[in-house]
Structure formats: C-alpha cells, structure tokens
Amino acid sequence: MRQIRSPRALRVIPLTALMLISGCGEKEQVSSATPPPDVGVYTVRAQALTLTTDLPGRTSAFRVAEVRPQVSGILQKRSFVEGAEVKLGQQLYQIDPRTYEAQLRRAEANRTSAQNLARRYETLLKTKAVSKQQYDDALAAWKQAEADYQVARIDVQYTRVLSPISGRIGRSTVTEGALVTNGQAQSLATVTQLDPIYVDVTQPITKLLGLQKALESGRLQKTGENQAEVSLTLDDGSAYPLPGTLKFSEVSVDPTTGSVTLRAEFPNPNRKLLPGMFVHALLKEGVQNAAILVPQQAISRDTRGVPSVWVVKADNTVESREIQTLRTVGNAWLISNGVTEGERIITEGVQRVRSGIAVNAVEAKNVNLVDGFAATTEASAN
C-alpha cells in the first residue's frame, strides 16, 4: 500500500533548502570581503654608486735592515735598548778598536814616507838626478800608501757599528765580550722601519681584467683624484683610521694562484700596524652612475638557485620576476636587470603572497641599505 506524504512535510523541505542556500551565500559574501594582505615594499631607485673591492692581505715593513759587523773583533759595548726606536747613524755597538787604530797609525806613517819620497824625486827629476821611471814608481807608491791609509781609517770607523736606517730595533743576538767577525752569517740585530708600512694584497687576474674592461667601456667611471685611495680593516673588525695609497701592482701573475699582488702604503705614526698582521684592504674600483641595489631580504631563490623578487604592479597585483645579481654591497645586492627604477618590490610579508593576487602595499620598515648607495658629490661630478 503506497504511503501518502503529509502536505506539511512537503512545505518543510523547500524551507530547509532555502535556509541552506542562504547560508552558502553568506559564506561567499564573507569570503569575497576578505581584505588583501599587507606587504612592505621598497621602491627601486637608481643612483651613482662607488664600487669597492675587499681584498685580504698582510702588512710588511717599509724597510728592514740587518745589522752586521764589517770588521772582526771583541764586542765591547751595546749602546741601545732592545725594542726602542733608533735613528739613522746612531751607534749600536762598539768593537775593540785598538788593533785597527794601530794599523791606521802604521798606514799613516807609510803614507807620509811615500809622500816625502815622491816629492824628493820630483825635485831630483828636474836636475836629471833620477830617471822618469824612478819618479813614476815613487809617485805610484805614494798613491798606494794613501789608499792603504784610507782603508785603515775606514776599518777604525767600522769598529763603531751604526744603525743603517731609522726604525725600531729588535733583540740583540750577541752580548758584550762576544767575538764577531766580518761577513758572519748571524746578524747582530735587526732594525725595522714601521712608518710608513706596506700592505700587500692579492687580486684574481680575472677580476682585474673585468675592471679594466668596465672602465674602458664606460660602464664604470673613475672616482677622480682618490682613485688610488685605500682604506683598511684590521683582523678584529675595527677600522684603521688613516687612509693609504695604492702604489703599484706586480708585473707578473702568480701561476699557481692566478692572482696578482697589489701593494698599498699606509702612514703608521703610532706603530699600530706591525709586520705580518692579517688585514682587509678596501680598494676603490670606480663609479657606476645608474646602480640599482635590491635589499637581500627581498630576494628568494628557486631550486636551481635562480634569484627572483616579488614585484607589485601598478594595479597592486604581484608577480614574480627573475633578476641577475652582480655582487653584494653591504646588506644589498647590486643587480644588472630584472627590475627598473620606480618599481616596488616586496621585502615584508613575502610568505603571504602568490602570483596574481592583490596586496595592500606600504613602505617597508626593514629596509636599511648601505650608506655607500647614496653617491657623494665628488662621485656624481665624475
């Protein structure tokens, strides 16, 4: 027997359906009313940028002189304090001079005798009492005696061992009473001139050639009178206060490393720099007139390592765009293409965006580019 449904039940079904449809509509309205995510953006700008290269290096003394005896004898006295500053020509040691003083007196006597004989023969030659050959022999003997006298006098002077340069003297390797000899292998002490001081750094030849090409093509401009200026950072991270000057580059390339050595000279009045210290030298390369820097936090890389940024377009929608990075400059990347001046790139809220969605873009607070991004007046003029 077929069951007949109540008209009341039939009226309930459409009502329930209407309620369900109404609920779905409310959810769609709520979903469509969700505001776009907030993101922080950095507006790209192009400015002149002074490019620099940070190269590791070591300090080396401006002059180094080993003190050695030039005559043999017993060391009588040491006349300096180890580790002190000495001047050019300052006496450092005294070698027993008695033997050399006696040789000087003998040489002086021989010189006087030869001189008197030569003058006597000169008078006798006028009267033909001696031959011309005898006179010439006497004159040559006089000159020989004069040379022997000068050698003996120099040997006496060499008993006073003097500093060959001005600088700081190290420890003495001998004491009073020691026998020293002319030409001995061991030096008596070493004097090192510390002001100024050299800094030797190495640069790959490929980078040096690339820099030369960039300057020749006009992509980089010279920085002007300060092109050869070098600044220094010590091993503990502190900056050396006095600038240096690039003096020369080596004329050959090291075949084992493919690098060329550059030498800079720094004033060192307080002797803060000592030979053998590890340092970083900052060399100016040139000025790029329309450099574009992108904050590091704006760049992401895919599985292939290709860098990209999120760009906010004029309609506030976003798109991912690949860029080409050249080098780091402080906390930013210098790029060659991918974005242009005036475009906005996302630096905050990157995790909330995907391609094509609309965003609410505000100026980012986490962007703090390096001070070097703003060009100096001098760099702009060049």
From Swiss-Prot:
Swiss-Prot/TrEMBL keywords: Cell inner membrane, Cell membrane, Coiled coil, Lipoprotein, Membrane, Palmitate, Signal, Transport
Lipid attachment points (N-palmitoyl cysteine): 24
Signal sequence extent: 1-23
GO cellular component, as recorded: plasma membrane
Induction remark: Low constitutive expression; the srpABC operon is further induced up to 17-fold by organic solvents (e.g. toluene and aliphatic solvents and alcohols) but not by antibiotics, heavy metals, pH, temperature, high NaCl or 60 mM acetic acid.
Subcellular location: Cell inner membrane
Domain of life: Bacteria
InterPro entries, sorted: CusB-like_dom_1, CusB_D23, MFP_Efflux, RND_pump_MFP
A Gene Ontology biological process term: response to antibiotic
Membrane topology, from the record: Lipid-anchor
Listed Pfam families: CusB_dom_1, HlyD_D23
Coiled coil: 98-127
Lipid anchor positions (S-diacylglycerol cysteine): 24
GO function term, MF aspect, one: transmembrane transporter activity
PANTHER family: ACRA/E-RELATED COMPONENT OF DRUG EFFLUX TRANSPORTER, MULTIDRUG EFFLUX PUMP SUBUNIT ACRA-RELATED
Family the entry assigns: Belongs to the membrane fusion protein (MFP) (TC 8.A.1) family.
Reported function: The periplasmic linker protein component of an organic solvent efflux pump. Involved in export of a number of low log POW compounds including hexane (log POW 3.5), toluene (log POW 2.5) and dimethylphthalate (log POW 2.3). The solvent resistance phenotype has been postulated to depend on the operon expression level.
Protein name (Swiss-Prot/TrEMBL): Solvent efflux pump periplasmic linker SrpA
